[in-house]
Amino acid sequence: MNPITKQFQYGQHTVTLETGVIARQATASVLASIDDTTVLVTVVAKKEAREGQNFFPLTVNYQEKTYAAGKIPGGFFKREGRPSENETLTCRLIDRPIRPLFPDGFMNEVQVVATVVSVNPQINPDIVALIGTSAALSISGVPFAGPIGAARVGVVNDEYVLNPTADELENSKLDLVVAGTDKAVLMVESEAQLLSEDQMLGAVMYGHEAMQDVIKAITEFTAEAGKEKWDWQAPAKDESLQTKIRELAEQGIGEAYRTTDKAERKGKLDQVKEQMVEKLTAEDENVDLEESGKIFHDLESDIVRSRIIAGEKRIDGRDPDMVRAISVATGVLPRTHGSALFTRGETQALVTATLGTDRDAQMIDELTGMNTNRFMLHYNFPPYCVGETGMVGSPKRREIGHGRLAKRGIQAVMPSHDEFPYTIRVVSEITESNGSSSMASVCGSSLALMDAGVPIKSSVAGIAMGLVKEGDKHVVLSDILGDEDHLGDMDFKVAGNTDGITALQMDIKIDGITRDIMESALAQAKSARLHILKVMDEAIGGHREELSTYAPRFTTIKIDQDKIKDVIGKGGAVIRELTESTNTNIEIGDDGTIKVAASDQADADAAIEKIKQLTANVEVGKIYQGKVARIVDFGAFVTVLPGKDGLVHISQIAEERVNDVNEYLKVGDVVPVKVLEIDRQGRVRLSMKEAAEKKEEPAPEAPAEPAAEEENKSEE
């Protein structure tokens, strides 16, 4: 084994890259480390593409091993299970900047596996994994236009911080990850506390400039450890077939893209393609239909892009900066705690908000420890939303990613747990989709939360932007359609309110996107965002003052800490019976604070009353209605308060002499008893005799009513 190591300084951290020792049978492997956080990244690439392969099969797997943090997995099997949400998001984070750097026509299967083998809680493994992936691909010899660098940028005390630690991030107004080559930014993922467009763009450029140290180091590492470059050539293009397809389909494609309705346009394109295939196969039975399909798609792209660059109207007839028609409705579902239907053109989201208690919070067992998630946002993209059939079930990577992006957009305006002590779950059901569904989810989530009465600081809106660039000309597109997303050069999504940005996600497919272009795109996005916010605020200007009648209400009571055990009971028996009998949820804090949650206030009041009884102290001289719990030779034990019994001595049962307790009392009888004494050991002495004496007061001189006379007789 001949290890090759590269070490360099990256801001406040030291990065180490090593190859040649571990996983030597992979096409390439790199052990990347930053301050005790270590990720093993392997790349395996097949030398030949599978026959008939018509897409690039790149797979990225990111896995966190619990041994990396010195922990043993929970559960029966004591093994790592399905990928966590964080692992899925990190897979996407790695995939997005590397995918555009593989050449067109490269169809060989490539698998990247990043395994976290050691973790320092202060250093997030995602940046380490990105750097390791870049290094492994660079030394592998596969056709890859890298290396790339990656950086996390924070804002602490209004200063940019490169790769902040976990402690620094807690005080940061920004958590931004940027990746790119030496010439261009390729990917941005961020969450912000209402920062301006200039601050966000400054962070992107700061990170891109800082990552040049990584790119330089990986280039040097590749020169020393890199394998021989693959002798791969892109398949030669069939120019005669291109010419033929242009003749057969160009006019039909052009006419189809004058159709503003998505379904109608798709139908026309399918018809043009079918006619093209018929004519091609009539002339040559052996024509390559897969290649024909690619050429047809490229022709679509050329036509749409050239029209946009020429200043013509967009696919659906809009100007570049125009937002589609917006429709907003709140309170659309009768029994949910909050709901909204947000429609923008042919994109629609049905969003609900549900309020729960702390018991409903999500407990996440991460490498760095247990975390409690009290705000969940889930995004669902069923096949019917694009008029297709398909599998319906657990969320895919894309759905998890879009849900997290929408959550980032909303997080900055959410109230603290002290201000609003509820667990909140928002679900966005995409019911129609033609571009920008994640940003529709941001808008719908804001509306649903306000409809539920959640005191968010302001409305939040999101917008998806696109870019078409040809040579020195470029056009920025607001509120892009699905087709414009596929055919454009940049896709970026911005969420925020009137004061600033809460989330920014950017994916750039080409070089040459300058700071000026990104600046103008962000300015255009702000204008679109403010327009959407105006429409939303007209529908619901702020959160509702009253919660839904179906939402739980909290009632709080404080008890002595030494009384907590009385409310819980042995094995939780008391609190279990209490919640079941009153139809409530009860949560007890270590400081003795008890929160009772109930949809019906009467249920909450009943639970509070029972808790008061459970935690009340027995008072000397007070008369209680006690229940006989046990009879002994020398008296009876009577329960005066839940869990608190006292002894009525045989001499205190009646005025006359009592020889047999059973002649006067039986188990279950409810009798008045007076507390005579509580001794040093906490034992309670009771008296039925004195309770009866106190109860017998002189009758009034006025004649008693007949009913009252009967009652007096019964008492005697």
From Swiss-Prot:
<dbReference type="InterPro" id="IPR036612">
    <property type="entry name" value="KH_dom_type_1_sf"/>
</dbReference>
<dbReference type="Pfam" id="PF01138">
    <property type="entry name" value="RNase_PH"/>
</dbReference>
<feature type="domain" description="KH">
    <location>
        <begin position="552"/>
        <end position="611"/>
    </location>
</feature>
<dbReference type="InterPro" id="IPR012340">
    <property type="entry name" value="NA-bd_OB-fold"/>
</dbReference>
<dbReference type="Pfam" id="PF00575">
    <property type="entry name" value="S1"/>
</dbReference>
<dbReference type="InterPro" id="IPR003029">
    <property type="entry name" value="S1_domain"/>
</dbReference>
<dbReference type="GO" id="GO:0003723">
    <property type="term" value="F:RNA binding"/>
</dbReference>
<feature type="compositionally biased region" description="Acidic residues">
    <location>
        <begin position="707"/>
        <end position="716"/>
    </location>
</feature>
<dbReference type="InterPro" id="IPR027408">
    <property type="entry name" value="PNPase/RNase_PH_dom_sf"/>
</dbReference>
<dbReference type="InterPro" id="IPR015847">
    <property type="entry name" value="ExoRNase_PH_dom2"/>
</dbReference>
<feature type="binding site">
    <location>
        <position position="485"/>
    </location>
    <ligand>
        <name>Mg(2+)</name>
    </ligand>
</feature>
<feature type="region of interest" description="Disordered">
    <location>
        <begin position="689"/>
        <end position="716"/>
    </location>
</feature>
<dbReference type="GO" id="GO:0000175">
    <property type="term" value="F:3'-5'-RNA exonuclease activity"/>
</dbReference>
<dbReference type="InterPro" id="IPR004088">
    <property type="entry name" value="KH_dom_type_1"/>
</dbReference>
<comment type="function">
    <text>Involved in mRNA degradation. Catalyzes the phosphorolysis of single-stranded polyribonucleotides processively in the 3'- to 5'-direction.</text>
</comment>
<keyword id="KW-0694">RNA-binding</keyword>
<dbReference type="Pfam" id="PF00013">
    <property type="entry name" value="KH_1"/>
</dbReference>
<keyword id="KW-0460">Magnesium</keyword>
<comment type="similarity">
    <text>Belongs to the polyribonucleotide nucleotidyltransferase family.</text>
</comment>
<dbReference type="InterPro" id="IPR004087">
    <property type="entry name" value="KH_dom"/>
</dbReference>
<dbReference type="InterPro" id="IPR020568">
    <property type="entry name" value="Ribosomal_Su5_D2-typ_SF"/>
</dbReference>
<dbReference type="GO" id="GO:0000287">
    <property type="term" value="F:magnesium ion binding"/>
</dbReference>
<keyword id="KW-0963">Cytoplasm</keyword>
<dbReference type="GO" id="GO:0005829">
    <property type="term" value="C:cytosol"/>
</dbReference>
<feature type="domain" description="S1 motif">
    <location>
        <begin position="621"/>
        <end position="689"/>
    </location>
</feature>
<dbReference type="Pfam" id="PF03726">
    <property type="entry name" value="PNPase"/>
</dbReference>
<dbReference type="InterPro" id="IPR015848">
    <property type="entry name" value="PNPase_PH_RNA-bd_bac/org-type"/>
</dbReference>
<keyword id="KW-0808">Transferase</keyword>
<comment type="subunit">
    <text>Component of the RNA degradosome, which is a multiprotein complex involved in RNA processing and mRNA degradation.</text>
</comment>
<dbReference type="Pfam" id="PF03725">
    <property type="entry name" value="RNase_PH_C"/>
</dbReference>
<dbReference type="InterPro" id="IPR036456">
    <property type="entry name" value="PNPase_PH_RNA-bd_sf"/>
</dbReference>
<dbReference type="GO" id="GO:0006396">
    <property type="term" value="P:RNA processing"/>
</dbReference>
<dbReference type="InterPro" id="IPR001247">
    <property type="entry name" value="ExoRNase_PH_dom1"/>
</dbReference>
<feature type="binding site">
    <location>
        <position position="491"/>
    </location>
    <ligand>
        <name>Mg(2+)</name>
    </ligand>
</feature>
<keyword id="KW-0479">Metal-binding</keyword>
<dbReference type="GO" id="GO:0004654">
    <property type="term" value="F:polyribonucleotide nucleotidyltransferase activity"/>
</dbReference>
<dbReference type="InterPro" id="IPR012162">
    <property type="entry name" value="PNPase"/>
</dbReference>
<feature type="compositionally biased region" description="Basic and acidic residues">
    <location>
        <begin position="689"/>
        <end position="698"/>
    </location>
</feature>
<keyword id="KW-0548">Nucleotidyltransferase</keyword>
<protein>
    <recommendedName>
        <fullName>Polyribonucleotide nucleotidyltransferase</fullName>
        <ecNumber>2.7.7.8</ecNumber>
    </recommendedName>
</protein>
<dbReference type="GO" id="GO:0006402">
    <property type="term" value="P:mRNA catabolic process"/>
</dbReference>
<dbReference type="InterPro" id="IPR036345">
    <property type="entry name" value="ExoRNase_PH_dom2_sf"/>
</dbReference>
